[in-house]
């Protein structure tokens, strides 16, 4: 089976509307991913274990913390006790709730609150780039007092002559730095 055909079948399976769990299957919530296509999950009764992602879902389906899964139990596993059968999307969850098959322990969880929504807090932060911190709470508390914040920013700036990167003793070519400084001071 080609890659495109496989992806088409997996997508069709994930997007099926009417999913009824078999008697041995369980609905679980994803707590995290320790790696190696394993996901730590929690059942409705609070027991935690690892669930493996079968090869058909790898590179085609993405799972994040808080998502719900339908899993098949594995008897021979000590730590890995289940294998994912299906990733439950919002339409699946709504259908299971209407049918009365949704666990009561997860009743408040399917619709995420605004604090849990898909925000930027879970995204990877590139430490090789300068980050600009924006504090919206502080701006709201000030009530539009922009004059004081502008004055604080001016006070924080270092004068050009006091900046450490401009000191001639720190430069590799001291002669050229001194020449540049004299050129700047004289304006020629």
UniProtKB/Swiss-Prot annotation:
Alphabetically ordered keywords of this record: Nucleus, RNA-binding
The protein, known as: Probable RNA-binding protein EIF1AD
Main localization category: nucleus
Region: Disordered, residue numbers: 107-188
SMART domains in UniProt: eIF1a (SM00652)
A Pfam family matched in the record: eIF-1a
Skewed-composition ranges (Polar residues): 179-188
Originating species: Gallus gallus (Chicken)
Organism lineage string: Eukaryota, Metazoa, Chordata, Craniata, Vertebrata
A single GO molecular function term of this UniProt record: translation initiation factor activity
PANTHER family: RNA-BINDING PROTEIN EIF1AD-RELATED, TRANSLATION INITIATION FACTOR-RELATED
Subcellular location: Nucleus
Domain S1-like: 14-92
């Amino acid at each position: 089976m080609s890659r495109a055909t496989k992806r088409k079948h997996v997508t069709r399976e994930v997007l099926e509307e009417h999913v009824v769990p078999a008697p041995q299957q369980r609905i679980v919530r994803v707590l995290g991913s320790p790696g190696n296509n394993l996901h730590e999950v929690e059942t409705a009764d609070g027991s935690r274990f690892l669930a493996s992602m079968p090869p058909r879902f790898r590179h085609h389906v993405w799972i994040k913390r808080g998502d719900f899964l339908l899993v098949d139990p594995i008897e021979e596993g000590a730590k890995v006790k289940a294998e994912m059968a299906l990733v439950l999307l919002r339409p699946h969850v709504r259908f299971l709730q209407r049918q009365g098959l949704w666990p009561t322990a997860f009743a408040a969880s399917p619709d995420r609150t605004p604090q849990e929504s898909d925000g930027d807090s879970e995204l990877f932060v590139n430490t090789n780039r300068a980050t600009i911190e924006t504090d919206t709470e502080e701006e709201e508390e000030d009530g539009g007092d922009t004059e004081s914040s502008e004055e604080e920013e001016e006070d924080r700036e270092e004068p050009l002559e006091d900046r450490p990167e401009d000191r001639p003793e720190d430069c590799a070519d001291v002669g050229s730095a001194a020449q540049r400084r004299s050129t700047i001071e004289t304006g020629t």
